[in-house]
């Protein structure tokens, strides 16, 4: 019994010594990690892809196959930006770009169409009533040269006036009387060449030929021999072919970039080898309400008549603006209600800022205001940072500051 009691006593003594030793070692152990955990109070957990949904405990995201991320109390700050773990930004491929100042270049092609030049347009009319003796073999679409005969007419009023003129000449009429009759013929529409012929030959002309007043293409001509024709009836319509018009619809938002003809390059698929010369251009004043475009009209040389009305063409606009603030277009966050970027300050914090966009072209966006030359903006990996800014309240602070400046 004594032996058993001795063994039990030894075991109790050993347990007491072990417990005391464990307590001493536990007290001597550095409390760094415990202290660190205690200092970093967790407010909630969240999925970076759905930052507005918060969870009260860790685990897997119900939206994505990824662990929830803790939001620590010491990350809440009154500063305007947010700080993100560098490992996270590196893994997500966050990249930055510098705000620069320079011209915004613009190069875009627009479909265009060849049409008649409305300034090269002539209407041939009968200046007095008569009847048609002869119609020359012409029809719509035929090309004519200036002075080409269109039809022969007999006009009784002109014949009568010529008879009066010759009678006065024979009976000794005064110069005033004869000149009055000639002026009456001019007002009645008798061609000046026929009047000169009357004076020179002293013979009555009974048949008169109407001729093409310009080079061009007949677009209206529907008369036959033997038809009566009334005063001011349209005999023919002729459209000139040199120069022609080429028109294209361009967005109203880039109209301010159009300055001179050197910015345009014009090509026609039907004649890809042809070099086209633009005489002049004009932006028509009206804006199409449906497409928000303006009509750009070019006057193009067409001496060889290679360009035909109705042909398709391509107009390429190459231009550049005055120097302005530029950022990569992928750095812009456009929600529809506001436009913002994420900048990087001197301390490495990500700060959201509102910007006013002027124009975008070829992956570059020009700004009216909001940034300064030399600032850094995030151009890749925006989603994580913008989500973090939303969670931390940085976006609300940005909007509050913008509202304060506005007032």
From Swiss-Prot:
User: What drives induction of this protein's expression?
Assistant: Transcriptionally regulated by CusR in response to copper and silver ions.
List keywords of the entry alphabetically.
Copper, Copper transport, Ion transport, Signal, Transport
Give one Pfam family.
HlyD_D23
Q: How does it assemble?
A: The cus efflux system is composed of CusA, CusB, CusC and CusF.
Q: Which InterPro entries match?
A: CusB-like_dom_1, CusB_D23, HMBD, MFP_Cation_Efflux, RND_pump_MFP
Q: Would you say which domain of life the source belongs to?
A: Bacteria
* Keyword Signal belongs to the record: yes
Q: What does this protein do?
A: Part of a cation efflux system that mediates resistance to copper and silver.
Could you identify this protein by its name?
Cation efflux system protein CusB
Give me any GO biological process, just one: copper ion export
- Cysteine disulfide partners in this protein: none
GO-annotated molecular function: transition metal ion binding; transmembrane transporter activity
| UniProt record similarity statement | Belongs to the membrane fusion protein (MFP) (TC 8.A.1) family.
Q: Which Gene3D superfamilies match?
A: 2.40.30.170, 2.40.420.20, 6.10.140.730
Name one cellular component (GO) term: membrane
Has keyword Signal? yes
* Signal peptide extent: 1-28
């Amino acid at each position: 019994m004594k032996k058993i009691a001795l063994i039990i006593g030894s075991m109790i003594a050993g347990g007491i010594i072990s417990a005391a030793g464990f307590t001493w070692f536990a007290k001597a152990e550095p409390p760094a990690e415990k202290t660190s955990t205690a200092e970093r109070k967790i407010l909630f957990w969240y999925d970076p892809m759905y930052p507005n949904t918060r969870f009260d405990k860790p685990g897997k995201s119900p939206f994505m196959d990824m662990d929830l991320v803790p939001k620590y109390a010491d990350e809440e700050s009154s500063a305007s930006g947010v700080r993100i773990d560098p490992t996270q930004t590196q893994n997500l491929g966050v990249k930055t770009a510098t705000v620069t100042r320079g011209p915004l270049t613009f190069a875009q092609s627009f479909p265009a169409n060849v049409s008649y030049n409305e300034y090269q347009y002539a209407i041939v009319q009968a200046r007095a009533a008569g009847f048609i003796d002869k119609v020359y073999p012409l029809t719509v679409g035929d090309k004519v040269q200036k002075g080409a005969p269109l039809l022969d007419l007999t006009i009784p009023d002109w014949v009568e006036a010529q008879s009066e003129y010759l009678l006065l000449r024979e009976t000794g009429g005064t110069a005033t009387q004869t000149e009055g009759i000639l002026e009456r013929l001019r007002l009645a529409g008798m061609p000046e060449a026929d009047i000169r012929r009357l004076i020179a030959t002293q013979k009555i002309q009974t048949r008169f030929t109407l001729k093409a007043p310009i080079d061009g293409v007949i677009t209206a001509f529907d008369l036959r021999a033997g038809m009566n024709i009334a005063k001011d009836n349209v005999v023919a319509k002729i459209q000139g072919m040199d120069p022609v018009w080429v028109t294209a619809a361009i967005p109203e938002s880039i109209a301010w970039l159009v300055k001179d003809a050197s910015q345009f390059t014009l090509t026609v698929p039907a004649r890809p080898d042809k070099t086209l010369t633009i005489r002049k251009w004009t932006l028509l004043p009206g804006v199409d309400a449906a497409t928000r475009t303006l009509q750009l009209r070019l006057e193009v040389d067409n001496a060889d008549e290679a360009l035909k009305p109705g042909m398709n063409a391509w107009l390429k606009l190459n231009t550049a603006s005055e120097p302005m603030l530029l950022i990569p277009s992928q750095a812009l966050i456009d929600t529809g209600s506001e436009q913002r970027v994420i900048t990087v300050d001197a301390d490495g914090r990500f700060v959201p800022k509102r910007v006013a966009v002027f124009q975008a072209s070829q992956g570059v966006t020009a700004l009216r205001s909001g940034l300064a030359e030399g600032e850094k903006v995030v151009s890749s990996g925006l989603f994580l940072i913008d989500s973090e800014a939303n969670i931390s309240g940085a976006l609300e602070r940005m909007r509050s500051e913008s509202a304060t400046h506005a007032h």
